[in-house]
């Protein structure tokens, strides 16, 4: 029942427009998180596993972002920003995003990947491998990047096509 109520609260406020919608989302979504500072949430956001997410002050989640942390951990540092359409899926693993990190639109961070060791067995039947993604402070990840488990992006790095 608690999971249902969480999803209901998220869905009910996800598309409320204007500054009033942003305020309502912060006020009513904040208790769902493990920790949530003064964050800003755009419209159309989908989330599951909020109790495993920590968002510091100044975090900005753009419209249409998806955040998942069922059985995993998502930590976002101060002033980290997700542009519209970013997917962060920490389910089963860990994703740690540092301070002042900018992540471009359409980027996907996923703490799980398919196993593909066997040539005889279809990939879809080989299960998943879970791991960590660590993005240190002051990083810019450009649009439409995909970050998979086992990745560490160092302080001040820029990730994107030339």
Model-assigned labels for residue ranges:
Residues 46-55, 61-151:
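Flexible, glycine/small-residue-enriched loop-and-beta-strand segment within the central core
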Residues 1-38, 100, 106-107, 113-119, ...:
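Terminal amphipathic alpha-helical/low-complexity segments used for targeting or macromolecular assembly
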Residues 14-15, 45-47:
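Short histidine/acidic/glycine/proline-rich micro-motifs that form metal-
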Residues 40-42:
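Conserved short histidine dyad/triad with adjacent acidic residue
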